[in-house]
């Protein structure tokens, strides 16, 4: 579609049913002109925020389709998840997850303080940071790349310093408004089951 290609979100049920496929990072393009143009002009994300994540090797442009590539890492710095977002602005945008990605390590940033902001998609996370830039690198953020709670539960496990969960980012930026009540309820149930953090909504 408009030169974009990939696969759409897959449910957690499908992750369990499918035979695991090898995880391979998409090949990088030699420049990031289309990614910067799309994120800055179409999504109004601050250049400094984009560059910060680029320097962390968390955002780049793929060579084949010029999608934005969002990379999620595990605690030892190994890439474990890739979400791709098309840069074409006409028609239905492509969004997809690379085969073999571990949903526990979707696009996220751990800054070390005691609150985590939760979002549905990486674009929403970057938009929020662009709006609230003061001391942003001290905070924690996670993009679920869908609506399952795997990545939220993982960032809480890996960062015991986090005591509060801010649902506001998820509620304000989600495109799937009809599912927010059930998602919030599922988070609360998961946290109760694990004896984990307070809600900071």
Q: Model-found features: residue ranges?
A:
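TOPRIM metal-binding catalytic domain and adjacent DNA-binding surface shared by DnaG-type primases
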Residues: 1-68
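Detector for Asparagine
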Residues: 2, 29-31, 67, 74, ...
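A general marker of short, structured functional hotspots
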Residues: 5, 11, 19, 34, ...
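Short, Lys/Arg-enriched charge-dense amphipathic segments
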Residues: 14-24, 28-30, 34-35, 70-84, ...
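A generic structural signal for short, well-ordered alpha-helical segments in conserved domains
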Residues: 36, 125, 184-185
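Glycine-centered flexibility motif
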Residues: 56-57, 96-103, 177-184, 188
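Phosphate-handling DNA/RNA-contact segment within nucleic-acid enzymes
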Residues: 61-158
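TOPRIM fold recognition
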Residues: 130-201
């Amino acid at each position: 579609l408009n030169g974009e290609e990939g696969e759409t979100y897959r449910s957690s049920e499908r992750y369990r049913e499918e035979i695991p496929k090898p995880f391979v990072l998409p090949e990088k393009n030699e420049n990031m002109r289309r990614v910067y143009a799309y994120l800055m002009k179409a999504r109004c994300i601050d250049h400094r925020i984009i560059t910060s994540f680029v320097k962390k090797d968390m955002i780049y442009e793929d060579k084949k389709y010029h999608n934005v590539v969002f990379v999620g890492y595990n605690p030892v710095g190994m890439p474990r998840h890739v979400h791709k977002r098309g840069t074409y602005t006409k028609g239905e945008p492509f969004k997809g997850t690379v085969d073999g990605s571990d949903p526990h390590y979707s696009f996220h940033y751990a800054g070390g303080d005691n609150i985590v902001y939760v979002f549905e998609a990486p674009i929403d996370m970057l938009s929020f940071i662009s709006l609230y830039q003061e001391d942003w690198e001290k905070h924690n953020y996670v993009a679920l790349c869908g609506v399952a709670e795997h990545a939220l539960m993982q960032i809480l496990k890996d960062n015991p310093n986090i005591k509060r969960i801010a649902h506001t980012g998820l509620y304000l930026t989600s495109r799937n408004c009809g599912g927010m009540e059930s998602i919030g309820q599922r988070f609360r149930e998961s946290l109760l089951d694990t004896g984990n953090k307070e809600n900071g909504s």
